[in-house]
């Protein structure tokens, strides 16, 4: 089905927003982007809602000036998102935007949660905002390059993980990543598909 027909049936667009940030020596640059792009693909397939190309740059903490990383300021990301959403709202008739991100930085989330539109609604789905309960050993799942990121990447993109550099103290595995991914996907589908 063409994008135009899908938008007529349900004028909703998934917009994955990642970051180009280093998550330690064992994970690839753009780890957050890989996670949200895979989730956006699977959510789109499950719901029939088209997804926009990923926005690969976001706001990241100034304490992470590692090689290869590149960030936008909060105001810049906010402006870029407002302009893109205005374009999709006016040009394609989109009336609901589902922003999907996996970056726990407060400024990043603020930029995405304060988007303004003429008529459309904007929903922000933050992977790290989910309650993982006892699914993680690490009490702080939002740590870049930690148990959550590493397990997810070991599941969805194992070729991009430097297995020999994964910290031994991390309770990360591909099996855990698969279970976490299924949990995340189901929670997001519940939010996305609720009437």
Describe every region a protein language model picked out.
Residues 1-98, 102-195:
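Extended, histidine- and acidic-residue-enriched regions that form the cofactor-binding/catalytic faces
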């Amino acid at each position: 089905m063409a994008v135009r027909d899908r938008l007529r049936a349900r004028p909703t667009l998934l917009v994955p927003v990642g970051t180009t940030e280093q998550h330690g020596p064992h994970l690839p640059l753009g780890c957050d982007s890989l996670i949200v792009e895979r989730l956006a693909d699977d959510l789109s397939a499950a719901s029939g809602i088209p997804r926009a190309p990923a926005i690969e740059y976001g706001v990241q903490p100034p304490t992470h000036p590692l090689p290869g990383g590149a960030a936008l300021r909060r105001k810049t990301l906010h402006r870029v998102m407002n302009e893109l959403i205005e374009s999709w709202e006016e040009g394609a008739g989109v009336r609901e935007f589902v922003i999907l991100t996996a970056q726990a930085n407060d400024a990043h989330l603020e930029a995405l949660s304060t988007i303004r539109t003429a008529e459309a609604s904007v929903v922000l789905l933050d992977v790290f905002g989910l309650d993982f309960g006892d699914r993680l050993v690490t009490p702080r799942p939002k740590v870049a390059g930690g148990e959550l990121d590493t397990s997810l990447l070991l599941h969805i993109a194992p070729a991009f993980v430097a297995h020999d550099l994964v910290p031994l103290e991390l309770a990360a595995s591909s099996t855990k990543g698969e279970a976490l991914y299924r949990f995340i996907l189901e929670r997001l589908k519940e939010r996305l598909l609720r009437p």
